[in-house]
UniProtKB/Swiss-Prot annotation:
GO terms for molecular function: carbohydrate binding. It is found in: Cell membrane. The chain crosses the membrane at residues 80-100. Heterodimer with KLRE1. PROSITE patterns: C_TYPE_LECTIN_2 (PS50041). Signal peptide: none annotated. Residues 139-245 form the C-type lectin domain. This is Killer cell lectin-like receptor subfamily I member 2.
């Protein structure tokens, strides 16, 4: 009897517990409230925002490799820069290759050009030194200068050269003519018609222009000036540029 009562009593307790858990009031207590749900959502949003801010101020080191595409953007950029620099280097080398020969040719011309004729200036007063300018050109032991600003007669030209302890240029070789042609020197020269054909000295490149003249004209046209590779006879009273020569 006592056992049965005990069993019944335990059964009643279990039923009470089961009934209590199944009751609506108990289930409502077990469910999270709306306030708790909102706070949970807010915390999750706050964590997301904090994570974004952290990524902005503390970015992860770039690996430089896109796993999906298999392409390294940094490598591509450096390849483009390398190609551009290589192209520029090739262009510069090409330009330098074209410039060097021209510089050497200019240097050769400058080496044939003399500098100031200091020995000539030392022998004259200051006024005479005005004639000594960078127009003087050296060729071997000879210095030449063409005066283009003040045209003079043949006699005046010779006198002007003598004031500089020089004389009108005397051409006695083909090389000397080539030197004068190189620097485009035209003017009175110290050459007179003496019945000889001076062109034999220099071959067919140098020509003496002969014209039909009577005896009186020959006297008046006994002076010559150089124009290009041609000796031109003309009246000695004509005013032209002149070329002075100084020998050391």
């Amino acid at each position: 009897m006592h056992k049965k009562k005990h069993i019944k009593h335990g059964t009643n307790k279990q039923e009470i517990i089961n009934i209590g858990t199944k009751s609506p009031t108990f289930q409502e207590k077990q469910r999270p409230s709306k306030t708790d749900q909102r706070s949970t959502v807010w915390r999750e949003e706050q964590k997301k925002q904090e994570l974004k801010v952290h990524r902005i101020f503390h970015p992860q080191p770039r690996t430089g490799f896109d796993v999906g595409k298999g392409i390294d953007p940094w490598l591509t950029t450096w390849q483009m820069i390398t190609v551009i620099l290589a192209t520029l280097c090739i262009i510069l080398v090409t330009k330098v290759g074209f410039l060097i020969p021209s510089l050497f040719s200019k240097g050769e011309k400058q080496s044939r050009k003399f500098s100031l004729l200091d020995p000539l200036c030392d022998r004259n007063d200051d006024s005479s030194c005005d004639f000594c300018s960078s127009d003087w050109i050296a060729f071997g032991n000879n210095f030449y200068c063409v005066f283009r600003e003040n045209s003079k007669t043949w006699v005046e030209s010779q006198s002007a050269c003598e004031e500089l302890n020089s004389h009108l240029v005397i051409i006695d070789s083909k090389a000397e003519v080539e030197n004068l042609l190189l620097f485009e020197m035209d003017g009175w020269i110290l050459h007179r018609m003496d019945g000889t054909n001076s062109s034999r000295l220099w071959g067919n490149d140098i020509k003496i222009r002969n014209t039909l003249m009577n005896d009186s004209e020959k006297k008046n046209h006994s002076c010559h000036y150089l124009r290009g590779n041609i000796f031109m006879p003309d009246e000695c009273s004509a005013k032209k540029t002149y070329i002075c020569e100084f020998n050391i």
